[in-house]
Amino acid sequence: MAKKKEMAKVLSQQCLQTGIYDMWIGTSLADEAKAGQFICVYPKNASTLLPRPISICEVLEDRQALRIVYRVAGQGTAEFSTYQEGESIAVMGTLGNGFPVEKVTDEKTTVFLMGGGIGIPPILQLAKSLNCDKKIIVGYRDASLFLKEDLEKYGEVIIATEDGSVGTKGNVMDAIREKGLKADMIYACGPMPMLRAIKQYAEKEDIPAYISLEERMACGVGACLGCVCKTKDVDAHSHVHNARICTDGPVFEAKEVEI
């Protein structure tokens, strides 16, 4: 589907936890949206120049609705948190490649769906899209959980918290070790230290892993080269081994990127 910019409508919005907001948007972009893709949301304040890329959390194609769950991290997302039902907003999408769910062909395959922090929301649509043995392993800072009940509809949820207030004390890798879990495939989204640990684990255990890289983006369409990552492959034309996260990703096979 070609990316396009359109006016959409806020269907609902609620605060899930301090600084974490849950918004449903009515838009035709839902027609072909995939797990792991993102949209760009445009602030209305003229002083806030750039759109904000936000991962797609959930899709309801029959209602032409997209769900985004985001953290207020600056002026743009702070503005988004004030939007009310019925308000019009400008969005562009759908952007990025998404998770390769077609890699899972057997319902007996055990798959780790791993999310950390604001990397948890895209795991929801991914869990909905897969028909297999799903272990949903998510990491939070503390007991301020979000999307737990939503995720539990689609697989076994294992929780890790940094302070040990819920589930395993530590991170998602600590939860795997504590539970003695094994997988045939890994999909993950979260902060870079978490993704590095997953990449190392997957390579050591010889498990295929696909990771969604979080990165600040400016244009969202590959023009500005502000969100590149190093890859093993060298481009035949430029002779550099960089990929644009916004267009070549944000999902990459873990063994193909240097992080």
Model-predicted segments: where are they?
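Ferredoxin-reductase
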Residues: A2-E85
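Short metal-binding segments enriched for Cys and/or His
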Residues: E256
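FNR/FR-type flavoprotein reductase catalytic core
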Residues: T77-R216
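Structural signal for conserved beta-strand scaffold positions within catalytic alpha/beta enzyme cores
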Residues: S12, E58, I159-T161, I211, ...
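Local cysteine-cluster metal-coordination motifs and their immediate loop/turn environment
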Residues: P122, E215-P250
